[in-house]
Regions:
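Core dinuclear metal-dependent hydrolase active-site scaffold
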Residues: 1-45, 50-51, 139-143
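Class I S-adenosyl-L-methionine
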Residues: 127-143
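Cap/insert and terminal regions of metallo-dependent hydrolase folds
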Residues: 28, 36-131
């Protein structure tokens, strides 16, 4: 197994939260959950796009819809699928794995969110495609 480096990054969440970037060989995984990413903070968005840069997979807190994340759930410490797409596209990441789903969401709701997220990614794409999936119990991702 190649040597691995781990980089931690402070995120926006009550009580603090850290994202982690795991790099080993030519592979990179970023874990960024329990974090509220905001479009209104350009310096922060740029900083996270750099943190996500060229990741093979970004495991991303997508608890809320964009509408909820910027209105009724603002400052609750969680993000949306749309923000995940925007950051990953800017970063040149290859796979966005939506994680930390709203506990009240049914499987059908999560499937619809994935479908909508894929469509959004498709219509906003300016570079290489970003694969979108939803995390589930016991999921394994081959790098």
């Amino acid at each position: 197994m190649p040597a691995m480096s781990v980089t931690a990054k402070l995120q926006r969440h009550a009580g603090n939260s850290y994202g982690y970037r795991f790099e080993g060989g030519d592979r990179c995984v970023v874990y960024s959950t329990d974090s509220e990413h905001k479009f209104t903070e350009p310096d922060e968005s740029t900083s996270f796009a750099r943190f996500f840069r060229n990741a093979d997979v970004v495991i991303f807190d997508a608890m809320y819809s964009l509408a909820d994340a910027i209105s009724v759930k603002a400052d609750w410490g969680h993000s949306s699928n749309i923000v995940g797409v925007e950051l990953c596209q800017r970063a040149g990441a290859r796979h966005l794995c939506l994680f930390h789903h709203e506990p009240a969401s049914s499987d059908d709701t999560i499937d619809r969110v994935v479908k909508d997220t894929r469509r959004y990614e498709e219509i906003t794409r300016t570079g290489a495609p970003l694969y979108v999936s939803a995390a589930y119990d016991a999921m394994e991702i081959d790098l």
